[in-house]
Amino acid sequence: IEKPDYWLTNEEPWGHIDYNRSQKVSFGGEVVEENGKKVWKPAWSVRAVPVDYMVPGYASGRVNTLRLWSAKSYDEFDLLTFNKSEYLDAVKPQVKAENISKILYPEDSTPQGKALRLEQQYFFVSASIHDAIRVFYPGQDKPDLTTFPDKINFQLNDTHPVIGIPELMRVLMDEYGYDWDTAWKI
C-alpha cells in the first residue's frame, strides 16, 4: 500500500529549501491583444519553491544537485473569508496550489485527474526553464538568450517533459520578446 512520505515536515537534513530562488508559474487565463500584440493574461499563479538534495557520485569525488519543486500559493490564507465562517474557502488557494506537487503522477482516470496531471507537468517544466535562465544568466533582466543552447541542454526522458518545448518557445517570445523564428532556432 502506498502511503504519503512527508519528507519536508521533519526538518529534512539533506534537503535545502531556498525561497529566494522560487519561480512564478502561471496557469489558465486568456490571450488578449495589446498594441497589436497578443499577450497572455494568466488566471492564477503559484510559487515553485526549490528543494535541493546533494547527490554524491559513486567513486567520482563529485556531488550533483537534484532539484525538486514544491508548489506553494501566493495567497495561503484569506482572513476575510475565514471571518465570514467560510473556513474551507479561506484555504482553497493553498490547497489548489499544494495539490500540484503533493503526489507525483496522480491518478488521471477522471477529468479532474487529467487536469491535475497536466498542471503538474507544466509546473515542473515551467519552473525548471525559468530557473535555468536565472542560473545561467544571473542578474540579467533581458539576457541574450541566443547563447542558451551553448549553456544548457534539457533531457526529455518521457512524453511528459516534452511540454517544455512549447513552454520554452512561449517564454522566449512572451517574456523575452523574441520572434517565432529566432525562438525556434534557440
What do the PLM-derived regions correspond to, one by one?
Residues 1-186:
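A conserved ligand/cofactor-binding region detector
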